[in-house]
């Protein structure tokens, strides 16, 4: 709290236009006016976002994480995107993650290049496929969820 607050004061004194984002200001309202230039949360439901935006918001609202693409998800993206047209103070959100975290290795059996994630090397403890939650694979090939993102983002060009 105190260090982030000091950083925000520093940037304000420099008057260089930098904005400060700190998600935990939602959980500690003592810093709400000094620690973040945004109202921000992770994974708030669309109705929770609207509750803030309908009650005289003091700051723009950003979802610092709002879609987690584990498996083949993104099904709720449209509910959040509708808020963009409805509220000037809603500035969207950030998808977690854009890209899978994996490394390319040569498979010892087939000799082919394959992507490997946590746990594929008998490493323990491991996050296993939890690092495979992007909208593109680690080799930059698109996952099916990218179709949903492309559709909704395309409406706002």
Predicted regions and their residues:
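Surface beta-strand/loop "capping" patches
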Residues: 139-157
């Amino acid at each position: 709290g105190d260090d982030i607050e000091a950083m925000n004061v520093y940037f304000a004194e420099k008057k260089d236009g930098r904005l400060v984002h700190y998600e935990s200001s939602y959980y500690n309202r003592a810093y709400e006016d000094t620690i973040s230039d945004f109202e921000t949360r992770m994974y708030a439901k669309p109705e929770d976002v609207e509750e803030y935006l309908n009650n005289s918001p003091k700051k723009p609202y950003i979802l610092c994480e709002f879609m987690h693409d584990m498996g083949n998800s993104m099904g709720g993206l449209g509910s959040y995107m509708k808020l963009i047209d409805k509220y000037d103070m809603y500035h969207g959100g950030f998808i977690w993650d854009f890209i899978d975290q994996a490394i390319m290795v040569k498979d010892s059996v087939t000799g082919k290049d394959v992507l490997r994630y946590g746990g594929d090397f008998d490493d323990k403890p491991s996050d296993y496929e939890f690092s495979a939650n992007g909208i593109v694979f680690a080799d930059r090939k698109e996952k099916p969820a990218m179709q949903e993102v492309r559709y909704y983002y395309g409406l706002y060009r």
